[in-house]
């Protein structure tokens, strides 16, 4: 297992993206894919090329803003793009993605009906995308370091982080929070008893106030470095996505470091996230795109993706093929108790996006 990634909800404001136009690839038997780094099986692209003879140009994006800029510019040359479910309605409204011809996806029946039902909230009828991976956002603790400082504390509560007296005791061993307002921000709103979809100006002010009490104890706002900082014991508390917890554990094991990490989903609720393969409206290699999408719906293919990235996939038929160490981990494949704590965020209004962006700037500035 290598560097896993889900940096998908760290940016807001589609209209702020700067234009970028990518060279077009229209050769027969070619495919242009746009995805997060290290967010697919180690040999998936190579295997697809070998099996189909289709030549793949595989581009990576490092931030939501970068992805938005390219897609909103149009004429990108991409045929398949990985899209965050929460932002999908905005992209559909802008006409970025085309409706899929389900008859060309012979492996569609492998998808989990429960995941498809949830995705209806982003895309009515699941007409524009193929669900790929999903998970939660939570807190990863170095149990030994945390228990030494806060013995007996309830780690299923965000009180561990957002009660100043607790955060002060953890400051010396390091606290990392995601630089992602729709993840940690929504978690804190839920902790405050506020439904994120109903949040207004006064609610975002309460969120800012909650962060202000602990801001001095936060080491960093980060979406990447905790994967190294946790195994190196440079931090003891990290707000992470579910799959990244598993990657940090694997990195420690590979380095021969004894590390007692555990991932907790706060009992006050957390947002679930879903990533979806989509086909841009201006895709030029649609035959190749359908071949790739159907390939990614194969249980054997997507199981290898989960084994490599550490993220649960949306393919019901693939679960039995996933490494048992992953499929049996409730942090990655949530149990019934964890599922009860999860909710699917509803798309934000433009006003809510503006308020959250402003609140997040205040929080990070301290």
Across the structure, where does each feature detected by a protein language model lie?
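Conserved C-terminal helix/tail region of periplasmic/extracytoplasmic solute-binding proteins
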Residues: 228, 336-366
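N-terminal secretory signal peptides and thylakoid transit peptides that target proteins
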Residues: 1-16
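Mature extracytoplasmic/periplasmic domains
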Residues: 26, 275, 280-341
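Early extracytoplasmic/lumenal segment of secretory-pathway proteins
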Residues: 27-91
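A ligand-binding cleft/hinge motif common to bilobed small-molecule-binding domains
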Residues: 87-92, 239-257
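Short beta-strand->loop
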Residues: 98-109, 159, 255-271, 280-283
């Amino acid at each position: 297992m290598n560097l896993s990634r889900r940096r998908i909800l760290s940016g807001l404001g589609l209209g702020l993206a700067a234009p970028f136009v990518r060279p077009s690839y229209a050769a027969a038997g070619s495919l242009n894919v746009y995805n997060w780094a290290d967010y697919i099986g180690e040999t998936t692209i190579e295997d697809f090329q070998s099996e189909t003879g289709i030549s793949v140009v595989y581009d990576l994006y490092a931030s939501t803003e970068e992805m938005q800029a390219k897609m909103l510019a149009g004429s990108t040359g991409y045929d398949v793009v990985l899209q965050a479910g929460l932002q999908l309605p905005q992209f559909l409204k802008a006409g970025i993605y085309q409706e899929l011809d389900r008859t060309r996806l012979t492996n569609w029946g492998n998808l989990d009906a429960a995941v498809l039902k949830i995705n209806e909230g982003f895309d009515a009828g699941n007409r524009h995308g193929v669900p790929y991976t999903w998970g939660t956002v939570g807190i990863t603790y170095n149990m030994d370091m945390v228990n030494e400082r806060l013995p007996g504390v309830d780690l299923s509560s965000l009180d561990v982080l957002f009660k100043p007296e607790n955060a002060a005791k953890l400051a010396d061993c390091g606290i990392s929070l995601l630089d992602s307002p729709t993840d940690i921000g929504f978690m804190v709103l839920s902790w405050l008893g506020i439904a994120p979809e109903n949040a207004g100006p006064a609610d975002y002010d309460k969120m800012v106030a909650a962060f202000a009490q602990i801001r001095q104890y936060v080491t960093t706002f980060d979406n990447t470095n905790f994967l190294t900082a946790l195994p190196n014991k440079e931090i003891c508390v990290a707000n992470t996505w579910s799959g990244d917890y598993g990657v940090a554990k694997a990195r420690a094991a590979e380095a021969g470091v004894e590390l007692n990490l555990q991932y907790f989903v706060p009992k006050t609720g957390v947002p679930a996230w879903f990533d979806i393969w989509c086909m841009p409206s201006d895709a030029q290699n649609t035959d190749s795109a359908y071949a790739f999408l159907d390939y990614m719906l194969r249980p054997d293919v997507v199981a290898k993706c989960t084994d490599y990235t550490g993220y649960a996939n949306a393919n019901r038929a693939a679960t039995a093929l996933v490494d048992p160490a992953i499929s049996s981990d409730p942090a990655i494949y949530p149990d019934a108790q964890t599922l009860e704590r999860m909710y699917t965020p509803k798309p934000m209004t433009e006003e809510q996006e503006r308020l959250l962006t402003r609140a997040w700037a205040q929080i990070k500035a301290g």
